[in-house]
Amino acid sequence: MDFLGLCQRTRQECGISGSGPTTVVGQSGNLQRLIDWVNTAWMDIQTTHQDWNWLRTTMTFTTVSAQATYALGTGSGTCGVSVATFGMWNRDTFRNYPTAVGNRGEVFMDFIHFQTWRDTYQYGALRYTTTRPVQMSISPEKSICLGPTPNGDYTISGDYYLAPSLMSADADVPALPAQYHMAIVYRAMMSYGAYESAPEVYQRGELEFGKLMRRMTADRLPEATWAGALA
């Protein structure tokens, strides 16, 4: 369902008389309140977990010789990820290859904590040591920090999670899989039920929302991994 369809379905499920909305743009009063509840429900679902797999995407950028850090942004010398759409790095997904060679020369990059990176690669003469980077870190400002500092063009790739976003146009479609779209409707029903003192609507929304969220949590989050046995 798109944004408009979600709003229409919410009105129907809440038992609100009348029809519509016919658009999500330029509404007022009760219809605008309904539209806001749907958008709030969508935001609530997105922010329940930062690492929903439908928020995960991949970025690539090319290093600049003698430049160790790459800030968020889309201009020259950045990591190519817009601040507006960035949510969180998936730090265990980074790799690189010499740009001139191609991905036949690809290697994984180990993540290290920022203080370790700073004390290792940004100290004394090591600041000026340039070669192929084999480790990476994330600064407090969410910049990508490479170690050692690259000595030429390397293509860096890694995954990150998109920031939560609101819907604004009739045809906007939420990013979560279609089989879970009704979770937005059920969560919006809870807002309607609380506002209108309609416990039957609230309780039905809460029950069905809980069912879908449990399924989504089991199906759409990274698999849990376990540490090896202690020596």
How would you name each of these model-derived features?
Residues M1-A231:
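Glycine-enriched, solvent-exposed interface loops adjoining structured elements
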